[in-house]
Curated annotation (Swiss-Prot):
Region Disordered, residue ranges: 217-240
PANTHER family: S-ADENOSYL-L-METHIONINE-DEPENDENT METHYLTRANSFERASES SUPERFAMILY PROTEIN
Keyword Cytoplasm set for record: yes
GO molecular function: rRNA (guanine-N7-)-methyltransferase activity
Protein name: Ribosomal RNA small subunit methyltransferase G
Length: 240
């Protein structure tokens, strides 16, 4: 299982990869394994696992939201670049901003963007609470904000929804417990200006596990007092 497997699986969803994109994915895999020996980027390093559980899994967001247009995307807590870098490779017109609080991951992502010759990728070393506060230019400025298995949805909603422009979407990419998390997060989602538009449940190929994608539309502006100061959303999520 490698890049040709990815090509085949994406074609089932009318997504075609050219030679440059195939090479970008292969280089991505090689750099991920190389840098992972120096720093802990991922516990999944075998080729099959990376292509399935990182690359393919990241691109599933495009099965439910049309990415064939010029969109601004902010990826909160992207770690080794998931889901935003695979999406950027497949849809090069996307304008991507990645926010991560750990400097070593920022170093990797900057190197990766250069090595893959990606244009329109900005990597920011910052906590999401600070990035989305009322004093910055980033608040309510993105068409799509993504987060993939970073924290519970009740926490992520406070970090991500302030960054989404009205009419845009927050996409939370979760495992099989996404709907469970959604129940406790519903109150906060409403407070932050969001409305649950869809919950998409699907299986990864090869019985590799269930995934749930929670798509939240931004209906109104987030009150200025959110997000609260760094660390507070995680310690005391807004549940009711």
């Amino acid at each position: 299982m490698g890049v040709e497997w990815l090509v085949e699986k994406l074609q089932e969803h009318d997504i075609t990869l050219n030679d440059k994109q195939k090479q970008q994915f292969q280089t991505y895999y090689e750099l991920l394994v190389e840098w992972n020996e120096k720093m802990n980027l991922t516990s999944i390093t075998d080729e099959e696992g990376v292509y399935l559980k990182h690359f393919y899994d990241s691109i599933t967001a495009a099965f439910y939201i049309d990415m064939n247009q010029e969109l601004s995307i902010c990826d909160v807590g992207a770690g080794a670049g998931f889901p935003s870098i695979p999406l950027k490779i497949v849809f090069p017109q996307l304008k991507v901003t990645i926010v991560d609080s750990l400097n070593k991951r920022i170093q990797f992502l900057n190197h990766l963007a250069d090595a893959l010759d990606l244009r329109g990728v900005s990597v920011v070393h910052e906590r999401a609470e600070n990035f989305g506060n009322v004093r910055g230019d980033n608040r309510e400025s993105y068409d799509i904000v993504t987060a993939r298995a970073v924290a519970r949805l009740s926490v992520l909603s406070e970090l991500c929804l302030p960054l989404v422009k009205t009419g845009g979407h927050f996409i939370a990419m979760k495992s099989s417990k996404g709907e469970e998390e959604l129940e406790e997060a519903r109150f906060g989602i409403g407070v932050f200006g969001g409305r649950v538009e869809a919950v998409e449940t699907f299986e990864l190929p090869g019985d590799a596990g269930e995934r749930q994608m929670i798509i939240i539309e931004k209906r109104s502006k987030t009150p200025k007092k959110y997000p609260r100061k760094a660390g507070t959303p995680n310690k005391s999520p807004l549940l009711k």
